[in-house]
Swiss-Prot record:
Catalyzes the synthesis of GMP from XMP. One of its GO terms (molecular function) is GMP synthase activity. Its EC number is 6.3.5.2. InterPro entries: Class_I_gatase-like (IPR029062), GATASE (IPR017926), GMP_synth_C (IPR001674), GMP_synth_GATase (IPR004739), GMP_synthase (IPR022955), GMPS_ATP_PPase_dom (IPR025777), NAD/GMP_synthase (IPR022310), Rossmann-like_a/b/a_fold (IPR014729). This is GMP synthase [glutamine-hydrolyzing]. Residues 9-207 form the Glutamine amidotransferase type-1 domain. It catalyses: XMP + L-glutamine + ATP + H2O = GMP + L-glutamate + AMP + diphosphate + 2 H(+). It comes from Pseudomonas fluorescens (strain Pf0-1). Pathway: Purine metabolism; GMP biosynthesis; GMP from XMP (L-Gln route): step 1/1. Homodimer. The keyword Cytoplasm does not apply. Keywords: ATP-binding, Glutamine amidotransferase, GMP biosynthesis, Ligase, Nucleotide-binding, Purine biosynthesis.
Length: 525
């Protein structure tokens, strides 16, 4: 009998924290499957999920205010360990008989907590030991309220000068609460704390590994698809590439990929996709050269949102036209990943985390009367990358910087023209090439060039040149929700600028974008 990699599972209830997905990713990194659900998850569904432990995540509300979110009573009736983080600790305290109040001294950012209670959760975990033997942890705080009275059967776990009950525990029931965030990297021992809860206290086994995920996905694809044929839109991005590799391994020639070349790709990207999948792996790939169709449809349009819609509609038209030439296709594969399928405004109350769901190829499944196969729908992006390596995809492909679905169409400000796309492609290639040479490519999270439809005077040799302006953009981020502009060395920027201006006749000036997110976004459009 095949191993059930979902057998040991953790339930995470979301109260609206920006860090909730990070908790889920940390649990998965430990090697244990988990799911993220809104705080008002149906009680029957909680029992049916049968978790080996529950994590109550943080949130922006105040427990002592009317109609603030509460944890379903079923969680406390399951008889499994419960770990409350920030708001999760506060609602646990309130619901089990304690008290939460607003605090005049709010804690946001780094803090040191003293570990004052001996519990299974923090036993042997510390950053400091004082001369008097007191254990301390360096943590990340983000709270305005605090627990002022614990439930009767709890003990103080940790404290700070402004928050005497910064952690509480009941070892007998395996209930734990901390006011800090163990899921963020700023809490140095956060990974060990979560591992202690998930592996030791909940008793989970580390069944969720890339090799086992690959085996499970391949078995599920074969069971779902049988002998039917599958169609996949291959973009060359990480998600669709991993889906292609996974499907090819599972069903071989039953898979046909359509690669739509829209004329808005990176330099040599089309050739690289064909070489990797068609030539090296033997995947059936149809390349649809549709540059003229995309550029004609985009002609005269400068509005970013309208450009995105035109590109999306044109993709569907081209993909549909190519798929109509194929016989006996029953399934459409998509590179949908877990953040895509977390319900939009998932809580019945509308107070939980809101993430827009999406379909990678619009309404195609309905229009073409195809059934969907989505082998990555349980995985976060970092898990998709690790799965790609497990399947033998090259590191540089799997860890390539993100590229927007509309491609260069949203990196050319205003109207898209072939001339602009050709110039931008070459400039972007130079930037990425120099980042790799200087060993900076994997130090930044995303880097690209933006084409600005304005001209600037330059001097080349004895002559003046009136040509286009481009901007370099490089950012560092963990989650892409916030990002800092990358502090690249001046020498590197000088090399990139010099090469672009000297090698590309149509560009006379190079600028560097020093805007962080927020207030700016990472992409310009």
């Amino acid at each position: 009998m095949a191993l059930d990699i979902h057998a040991h599972r953790i339930l995470i209830l979301d109260f609206g924290s920006q860090y909730t997905q990070l908790i889920a990713r940390r649990v998965r990194e430990i090697g244990v499957y988990c799911e993220l659900h809104p705080f008002d998850m149906d009680e029957d569904a909680i029992r049916e999920f049968a978790p080996k432990g529950v994590i109550l995540a943080g949130g922006p509300e105040s427990v002592h205010e009317a109609n603030s979110p509460r944890c379903p009573q079923a969680v406390f009736d399951l008889g499994v360990p419960v770990f409350g983080i920030c708001y999760g600790m506060q609602t646990m305290a309130e619901q089990l008989g304690g008290k939460v109040e607003g605090s005049e001294l709010r804690e946001f950012g780094y803090a040191r907590v003293d570990v004052v209670g001996k519990s299974r959760l923090l036993d042997g975990i510390e950053d400091h030991i004082d001369a008097d033997g007191l254990f301390g942890l360096d943590v990340w705080m983000s709270h305005g309220d605090k627990v002022t009275k614990m439930p009767s059967d709890f003990h103080i776990l940790a404290s700070t000068p402004s928050c005497p009950i910064a952690g509480m525990f009941n070892d007998e029931r395996a209930y734990y609460g901390v006011q800090f965030h163990p899921e963020v990297t700023h809490t140095k021992q956060g990974g060990r704390i979560l591992s202690r809860f998930v592996l030791d206290i909940c008793g989970c086994e580390a069944l969720w590994t890339p090799s086992k995920i690959a085996e499970d996905a391949i078995a599920n694809i074969r069971a779902q698809v049988g002998t039917d044929n599958v169609l996949l839109g291959l973009s060359g991005g990480v998600d669709s590439s991993v889906v292609a590799a996974l499907l090819h391994k599972a069903i071989g020639d039953q898979l046909t990929c359509v690669f739509v070349d829209n004329g808005l790709l990176r330099l040599h990207e089309g050739e690289q996709v064909m070489a990797m999948f068609a030539e090296n792996m033997g995947v059936k790939v149809i390349r649809a050269n549709a540059e003229d169709q995309f550029l004609n449809n985009l002609a005269g349009e400068a509005d970013p949102e309208k450009k995105r819609k035109i590109i999306g509609r044109t993709f569907i038209d081209v993909f549909d036209a190519e798929s109509c030439k194929l016989d006996n296709i029953k399934y459409l594969a998509q590179g949908t990943i877990y953040p895509d399928v977390i319900e939009s405004a998932g809580a019945k109350s509308g107070k939980a985390h809101v993430i827009k769901s999406h379909h990678n190829v619009g309404g195609l499944p309905e229009e073409m009367n195809l059934k969907l196969v989505e082998p990555l729908r349980e995985l976060f992006k970092d898990e998709v990358r690790r799965l790609g390596l497990e399947l033998g995809l090259p590191y540089d492909m799997v860890y390539r910087h993100p590229f927007p679905g509309p491609g260069l169409g949203v990196r050319i400000l205003g109207e898209v023209k072939k001339e602009y796309a050709d110039l931008l492609r070459r400039a972007d290639h130079i930037f990425i090439e120099e980042l790799r040479k200087a060993d900076w490519y994997h130090k930044v999270s995303q880097a690209f060039v933006v084409f600005q439809p304005v001209k600037s005077v330059g001097v080349v040799g004895d002559g003046r040149r009136y040509a286009w302006v481009v901007a370099l953009r490089a950012v560092e981020t963990i989650d892409f929700m916030t990002a800092r502009w990358a502090h690249l060395p001046y020498e590197l920027l000088e090399t990139v600028s010099g090469r672009i201006i000297n090698e590309i006749e149509g560009i006379s000036r190079v600028t560097y974008d020093v805007s962080s997110k927020p207030p700016a976004t990472i992409e310009w459009e």
